[in-house]
């Protein structure tokens, strides 16, 4: 199969940091064929400066009318995702869409139904499934060394008291805010591990007051999974703030036979911003000092006479967002319905985000 002719919609940070580098890293699978750059001129184009042979369109309808384009990557603000994804699917294109997918569950459901009716792939860019720290946490949970997990805490905390002037991300428009931003990643990771929760309890706030924000920049969301059969209840705690000076706990997982704690962020984003490429040696490799710690007791330990836990350092799994695009290629090629980011998971994330807002507004838990 020749490389899939791909068009990227947008020329912002998302396109140049999270999409172009990974398409470029897989030349036998994807051809960077076209780009939507509305402000491009004959002499000035960000896309053409980076990729001299790329076709640059300033009009979406003209791009979608190009019969050579097989895959469209939607790397635009979330308030336009629904409209553009729908147009792309109706034009017969496979679609990769940046997160957050859509502002509402109903929009997302309609688009998945449209994609299915046309036998097209609709892939949401939940690249943080391939964060090394998350892959490490997942591996430890699946190994059973923690026993039954009863609490899974996931943070994404930064120290950013200021904000960029004029940033669309801080405007009160559909799909904006911390929950739809990093929250959609943390929720997706939780759903991929534990499935859809029974209920959601959340608190959302605007913590930075320089100047006051019109959208939330803090959340604490608890996903409740009740006891089922011989399984203990699980509480999943997801939290993010921009007011966290020097404390970067990423995961804290507690089970009946052990605990795991990890600090620091996955290195891929900072590596990409610094110009490192996905195929470069060391890409996605964590620093030794940020390796997580695992405390365990034997699985068959007597609960009435538990020994002192044994502590070991756990090397971080090497992540690579390139694996997302590998999976996109395989699904388009084989149509095997094996793409790892399933439609029911994406729809669960949409429901949880909507429930988080309702919970915070009503100061109550929302049953899904």
Swiss-Prot record:
Transmembrane segments: none annotated. GO terms for cellular component: cytosol; nucleus. One of its GO terms (molecular function) is kinase inhibitor activity. Keywords: Oxidoreductase. Coiled coil: none annotated. Belongs to the Gfo/Idh/MocA family. This is Uncharacterized oxidoreductase C115.03. It comes from Schizosaccharomyces pombe (strain 972 / ATCC 24843).
């Amino acid at each position: 199969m020749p490389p899939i002719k791909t068009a990227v919609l947008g020329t912002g940070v998302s396109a140049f940091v999270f999409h172009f580098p990974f398409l470029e890293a897989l030349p036998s699978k994807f051809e960077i064929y076209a780009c939507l750059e509305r402000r491009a001129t004959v002499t000035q184009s960000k896309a053409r400066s980076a990729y001299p042979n790329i076709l640059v369109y300033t009009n979406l309808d003209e791009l979608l009318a190009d019969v050579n384009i097989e895959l469209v990557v939607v790397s635009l603000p979330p308030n336009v995702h629904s409209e553009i994804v729908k147009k792309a699917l109706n034009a017969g294109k496979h679609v990769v869409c940046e997160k957050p997918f859509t502002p509402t569950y109903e929009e997302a459901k309609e688009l998945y139904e449209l994609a299915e009716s046309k036998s097209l792939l609709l892939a949401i860019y939940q690249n943080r499934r391939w964060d090394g720290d998350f892959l490490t946490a997942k591996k430890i949970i699946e190994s059973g060394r923690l026993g039954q997990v009863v609490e899974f805490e996931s943070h994404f905390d930064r120290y950013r008291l200021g904000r960029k002037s004029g940033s669309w991300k801080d405007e009160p428009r559909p799909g904006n805010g911390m929950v739809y931003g990093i929250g959609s990643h943390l929720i997706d990771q939780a759903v991929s591990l534990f499935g859809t929760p029974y209920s959601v309890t959340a608190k959302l706030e605007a913590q930075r007051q320089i100047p006051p924000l019109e959208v939330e920049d803090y959340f604490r969301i608890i996903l409740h999974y009740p006891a089922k059969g011989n399984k203990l209840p699980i509480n999943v705690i997801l939290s993010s703030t921009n007011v966290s000076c020097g404390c970067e706990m990423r995961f804290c997982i507690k089970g009946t036979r052990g605990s795991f704690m990890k600090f620091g962020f996955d290195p891929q984003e900072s590596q990409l911003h610094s110009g490192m490429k996905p195929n470069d040696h060391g890409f996605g490799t964590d620093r030794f000092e940020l390796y997580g710690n695992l405390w365990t007791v034997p699985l068959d330990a007597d609960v009435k006479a538990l020994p002192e836990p044994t502590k070991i350092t756990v090397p971080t799994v090497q992540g690579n967002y390139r694996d997302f695009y590998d999976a996109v290629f395989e699904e388009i090629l084989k149509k095997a319905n094996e793409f790892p980011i399933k439609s029911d998971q994406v729809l669960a994330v949409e429901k949880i985000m909507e429930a988080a807002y309702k919970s915070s507004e009503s100061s109550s838990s929302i049953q899904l």
